[in-house]
Amino acid sequence: MKAHGSSDIEDIDLRRRFDEVIKQDERLVVISFWAPWCRNCKKIAPFVDQLSKANEKIFLYRVNTTFAEDIGAQQGIDALPTFQFFRGGKMLGDFKGSNMDAFMKALSNYV
């Protein structure tokens, strides 16, 4: 299932699928945790959409915490938007917030 809007980013709503995507080869997997009511999520969404199209070094997915509360709870999501970075099934780190410059700085630690 694709995320809201015209994005090519897949929305993950099942824990099984979440577990599958974070284990993808050695490329970086970025999971964006968001909700439709979250203003900051809407603020950064166009930037995230653009990033997913422009960077082939990463796999980018979204988890709508309104529908996939279990995944958000299991991942310890306590703020939106939150981005978690994975490689080979291991979480490398996370970023919370909608500041695009700070997000890119955090992302650059893993790409």
Residues covered by each model-derived region:
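Non-globular targeting/processing and membrane-anchoring segments
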Residues: 1-6, 75-76, 88
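Intrinsic disorder
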Residues: 12, 24, 35, 54, ...
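Beta-strand cores of modular interaction/reader domains in eukaryotic scaffold and signaling proteins
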Residues: 11, 29-32, 59-62, 82-86, ...
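Thiol-based oxidoreductase modules, predominantly thioredoxin-like and allied folds used
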Residues: 12-14, 33, 45-70, 77
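N-terminal leader/targeting and pre-domain segments
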Residues: 1-29, 105-111
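Local sequence-structure signature of Cys/Sec-based thiol-disulfide redox active-site neighborhoods
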Residues: 19-50
